[in-house]
Each structure stands twice: as structure tokens, then as C-alpha cells.
């Protein structure tokens, strides 16, 4: 079986700046990147040298999510892509 590690998690937030400030204070992380997102809107990445949170907003204003809905995706890095593919397919 392949070995993997969490690389990033992308979540939708109402205010990436405020969320980034919170996680930097709470976890001692730093800002890794910021800019326009691929889907429109804005993203700020905060984390350490190993993993990060991508804090995304589409700019549409206040967001109200059902439980679990703000999670967009989780990025994993694996040492054996073919082996990991066999596990999930």
C-alpha cells in the first residue's frame, strides 16, 4: 500500500484575511501564498513547510453553509500513485 501525507485542505470562508490571521495566531503558521483563485474569488494559503490551509472565498458576500459544506477538497501526496489508484478505484 502506498504511503501518503496531507498536503493541503481547501475550505470556503467568508473572509480569507480574517481566517488567515486567526490560523497564524492560533497555530504559529505563516502565509505561504495569496492571490486570485482558479474558480474566481480570492485565496490565502497559511501553514508551515509541510502542509497548509487554502482559505477561499468566491466574493459573493456572507456565506451560510450546511454542516460540512465549506470543505472543497483535501490534497494528498502519495509515494506510489499507481498503488494509491488501485486502492481507490
Residue positions per predicted region:
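Short, conserved turn/kink motifs that form compact alpha/beta structural patches or helix kinks used as
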Residues: 52, 59-60
Amino acid at each position: 500500500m502506498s504511503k501518503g501525507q496531507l498536503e493541503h485542505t481547501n475550505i470556503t470562508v467568508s473572509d480569507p484575511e480574517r481566517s488567515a490571521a486567526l490560523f497564524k495566531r492560533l497555530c504559529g503558521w505563516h502565509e505561504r501564498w495569496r492571490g486570485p483563485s482558479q474558480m474566481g474569488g480570492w485565496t490565502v494559503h497559511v501553514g508551515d513547510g509541510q502542509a497548509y490551509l487554502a482559505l477561499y472565498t468566491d466574493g459573493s458576500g456572507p456565506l451560510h453553509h450546511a454542516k460540512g459544506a465549506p470543505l472543497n477538497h483535501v490534497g494528498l501526496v502519495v509515494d506510489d500513485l499507481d498503488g494509491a489508484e488501485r486502492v481507490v478505484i
